Amino acid sequence: MSAHPDILVWIDCEMTGLDLELDELLEVTVVITDYDLTPLDPGFNIVIKPDQSALEHMGDFVTNMHTESGLINEIQNGVSLAEAEYEVLEYILKFVPDAQTAPLAGNTIGTDRSFLAKYMPRVDGHLHYRSVDVSSIKELARRWFPRVYFQAPTKNGGHRALADILESIRELDYYRKIIFVQEPGPTSQQAQAASASTVESWASRVR
């Protein structure tokens, strides 16, 4: 399977909590899209059986969340962390054989990336250091285009990783269609003029 030069590797993780020192991964899902946000494959999902101490550390909120989603019932049949890391990386390698070429994408992706860096360092190391975080665009839309923000597609993922990823891809597609300049975009001359105007307006602050 050939690699696409503009691939995005979308990853969503479900954890026992958000404390990087105590909590562990429960579920990891990967969806690969092209530059146009079209999924190249249905995606890959794996459930992990964490240490018992991590399960015992789960608070009521997280326990209820994973119970309602059905994830809690799948954990005992989950694979080891080492097996999960191997399978996740093997899946990504089908589309991204070269390291450090494809950015990680997702929603509030910093949290997922922190857990990947700790528990799946080979996966994190294979991805480009840059990330595409849909929540950044959401926050800018809230400030600059509030009507766009309030009309964004409703999310109903139920805290399962695959549904969460697909909703994040859909959300970015929405922002792209309503906020970003439509194809074919500005000409080089228009972009140069906008760049010069911006530099001039910031000249007193950026020297």
Where do the PLM segments sit?
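Acidic two-metal-ion nuclease catalytic site recognized across multiple nuclease folds
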Residues: 155, 159-207
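Short conserved catalytic/interaction loops centered on acidic-Pro-aromatic/His motifs
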Residues: 124-128, 148-152, 181-187
